[in-house]
Amino acid sequence: MSAEILLILVIALLLDRVLGDPDWLWSRLTHPVVFFGKAVEYVDEALNRGEFTKAWLKFRGVVGILVLLAGATALGVVLARLFDVLGALGSLLEVVTVAVFLAQKSLADHVSRVAAGLRRDGLAGGREAVSMIVGRDPNTLDEPAVCRAAIESLAENFSDGVVAPAFWYAVAGLPGLLAYKMLNTADSMIGHKSPKYLHFGWASARLDDLANLPAARLSALLIAAGAYFRRGAEAAKTAIEVARRDHGLHRSPNSGWPEAAMAGATGVQLAGPRIYGGVKVDEPMMNDAGRAVAAIEDIEAAVTVFYAACSVMTFAFAAAALPLLLF
């Protein structure tokens, strides 16, 4: 963790906060994550075919994810060395590269569209907007469930779309950032428990859990800090208490931390029973002392907490860089 890396990260966070993922750019260019997805598809098609034993499928899945991670890491090393040779221009290109893999503004924009859709077009508008960011069947959601889904998506993706990429870049530079994004892409594509991927995707899912472990805990603390600045000390205290108590109620070992913290920060109940691909997932509600009926205003409150949490994180990285720059 060098001063240069931290400084680049801070500037990249600010750039992503302002510009996000502009449609005019990515309608003309292919986003790097799309290439990562194509690499995952290639490995899936090459290794996950035919009839194999469970153990052999797991082994092939381990080989597949290691190949993908090695490729992403090697690309990160090449880019880091190239940018280093290019001097100031290279630093600028590295800022842009890091910003591309962050999701502050794009995430907040997607979640805010759910609130806007509900206000403009009622339940149909909210369902359409939330279907862009969650995997559950939107037609099974009433308005409070749409609001909960949006808030849960915001909290979970704060961890793996903002905090985790920033964390791994700070720790391991571009190789760490690209390896994390490849792993996270693989987990989203092959890390689920469908019959096809239960064994082949096992290694990707477990490694993703491990890689997100520090970021998930940091996300809960950052959400509590954001709640402190936007909603007061009591909201921050509740966010910490609910995160510590209820994170284990979630089926994911990591997602429960930011979601429970956001439930406490906004004062609403989150999680609970929901339907994915026609299959009902029964989970208890997080923050069972909170309001049972989430509303549009709760989405908007969550977005303000999210942005405050992002600001706290950016300030923390800047504060960490300062003594390294001075001494």
From Swiss-Prot:
GO terms for cellular component: plasma membrane. GO terms for molecular function: ABC-type vitamin B12 transporter activity; threonine-phosphate decarboxylase activity. The chain crosses the membrane at residues 63-83, 84-104, 158-178, 305-325. It is a multi-pass membrane protein. The keyword Cell membrane applies. Keywords: Cell membrane, Cobalamin biosynthesis, Membrane, Transmembrane, Transmembrane helix. InterPro entries: Cobalamin_biosynth_CobD/CbiB (IPR004485). It is found in: Cell membrane. GO terms for biological process: cobalamin biosynthetic process. Pathway: Cofactor biosynthesis; adenosylcobalamin biosynthesis. Belongs to the CobD/CbiB family. Converts cobyric acid to cobinamide by the addition of aminopropanol on the F carboxylic group. This is Cobalamin biosynthesis protein CobD. It comes from Rhizobium meliloti (strain 1021) (Ensifer meliloti). The lineage of its organism: Bacteria, Pseudomonadati, Pseudomonadota, Alphaproteobacteria, Hyphomicrobiales. The gene is cobD.
